[in-house]
């Protein structure tokens, strides 16, 4: 019997537990004390970390491997990537590679590596003092300021002019090392690829919808994006070049890019499970359980035949609400009854306090939809937007 080690599970990683069981594997998990109780009865063994930093995730993963050698290892989210990469490398089991894990975890390392590889990406500067980067930034306005290792748009903001740059430099003076980039115009997409021994088994392009500047919070995703075959082929070639530069071996890749008149321009890459229910969207779109596919790769199992194309079209809607105290919630049950809605939920209720939206953490719920064609999906998505309302004061 094989053993699958999950470094981090959370809520959205629970399908990995089911996937391991479906494949007949024992499942061992490393999780924080805060979330351990919710999964304790679902795994064969549980290692509780002493915190949620990269270092303490690694400590937990090292302890798990010392007690029992797994046959496969999966990192759930961003803070677990380095821990999983190190034990995958140590054990010689399938994984992205330690190099890919390190690059994935640091956006400044990505910029340096991809500049050397000739990958199209924004002009950039790594700074310890934003104010000291003023001359460079003012020559390239608008610019984007972002931290090196956060996810979910946290700390990302567009700076449109000189006055705004001075304000941001003062406000973020004690934040430490930051990345400053020339802003790139063009619609946002992501490229999800399952990779085995450096070769792409299958890839999908997802269209993103964001709030735009200054924080670019993602509010909707549409898998099997409506782009031409030529554009898709160009994106696949671009993705393959990025994988080669990253040193990617085996596992899941989530690559974010903007599509410009000159072609794709890289925003960032991550070698872990994408958020915003993209795995569920991929399953709905192509008729395969992507959590099980990732587990198969991790355990060295055979994969089924790759999909020939979408069997339906899927989207996620991740609503925001005006900052304040929630006074009423309308339409949730009606949304759940819609024939195109697969799942719908809200994370707020009456009297909840909603902070001003600066990152994905301030979104108030999720709706997953699937339909037989794009027009039906868009009509359903529009109806959900009209129906689901969170009122605040």
Where are these regions (language model features)?
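Extreme N-terminal starter segment of soluble prokaryotic enzymes
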Residues: 1-4
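Glycine-rich adenosine-cofactor-binding loop
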Residues: 6-15
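Peripheral (often C-terminal) accessory segments that flank ATP-dependent C-N-forming ligase machineries
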Residues: 13, 116, 133, 295-393
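Short, polar loop motifs at secondary-structure junctions
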Residues: 30-37
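Conserved N-proximal alpha/beta basic substrate-recognition cap immediately N-terminal to
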Residues: 41-126, 363, 376
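Glycine-rich phosphate-binding loop signature in dinucleotide/nucleotide-binding domains
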Residues: 64-70, 137-140, 173-175, 246
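Active-site nucleotide/adenylate-binding loops and adjacent lid/helix of ATP-dependent enzymes
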Residues: 105-185, 196-199, 221, 225-237, ...
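ATP-dependent carboxylate/phosphate-activation module, predominantly the ATP-grasp catalytic core
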Residues: 182-248, 252, 259, 266, ...
């Amino acid at each position: 019997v094989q053993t699958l080690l999950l470094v981090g599970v959370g809520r959205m990683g629970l399908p990995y537990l089911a996937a391991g069981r479906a494949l007949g594997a024992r499942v061992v998990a490393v999780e924080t004390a805060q979330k351990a109780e919710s999964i304790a009865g679902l795994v064969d063994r549980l290692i509780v970390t002493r915190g949620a930093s990269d270092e303490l995730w690694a400590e937990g993963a090292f302890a798990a491997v010392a007690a029992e050698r797994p046959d496969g290892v999966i990192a759930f989210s961003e803070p677990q990537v380095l821990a999983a990469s190190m034990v995958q490398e140590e054990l010689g089991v399938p994984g992205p590679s330690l190099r890919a894990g390190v690059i994935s975890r640091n956006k400044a390392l990505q910029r340096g590596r991809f500049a050397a590889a000739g990958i199209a990406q924004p002009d950039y500067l790594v700074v310890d003092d934003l104010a000291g980067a003023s001359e460079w930034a003012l020559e390239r306005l608008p610019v984007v300021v972002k931290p090196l290792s956060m996810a979910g748009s946290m700390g990302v903001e567009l700076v449109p002019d000189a006055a705004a740059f001075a304000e941001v430099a003062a406000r973020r003076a004690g934040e430490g090392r930051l990345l400053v980039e020339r802003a790139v115009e063009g619609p946002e997409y992501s490229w999800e690829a399952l990779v085995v021994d450096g070769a792409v088994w299958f890839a999908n392009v997802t269209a993103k919808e964001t709030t735009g500047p200054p924080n670019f919070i993602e509010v909707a995703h549409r898998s099997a994006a409506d782009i031409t075959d030529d554009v898709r082929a160009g994106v696949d070639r671009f993705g393959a070049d990025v994988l080669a530069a990253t040193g990617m071996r085996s596992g899941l890749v989530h690559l974010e890019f903007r599509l410009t008149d000159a072609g794709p321009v890289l925003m960032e890459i991550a070698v872990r499970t994408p958020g915003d229910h993209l795995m569920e969207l991929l399953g709905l779109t192509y008729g395969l359980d992507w959590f099980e596919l990732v587990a198969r790769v991790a355990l060295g199992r055979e994969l089924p035949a790759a999909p020939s194309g979408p069997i339906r079209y899927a989207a996620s809607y991740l609503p925001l609400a005006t900052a304040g105290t929630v006074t009423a919630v309308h339409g949730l049950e009606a949304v759940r009854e819609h024939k195109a809605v697969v799942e719908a939920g809200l994370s707020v209720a009456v009297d909840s306090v909603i902070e001003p939206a600066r990152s994905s953490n301030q979104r108030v719920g999720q709706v997953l939809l699937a339909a037989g064609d794009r027009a039906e999906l868009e009509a359903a998505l529009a109806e959900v937007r009209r129906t689901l309302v969170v009122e605040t004061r």
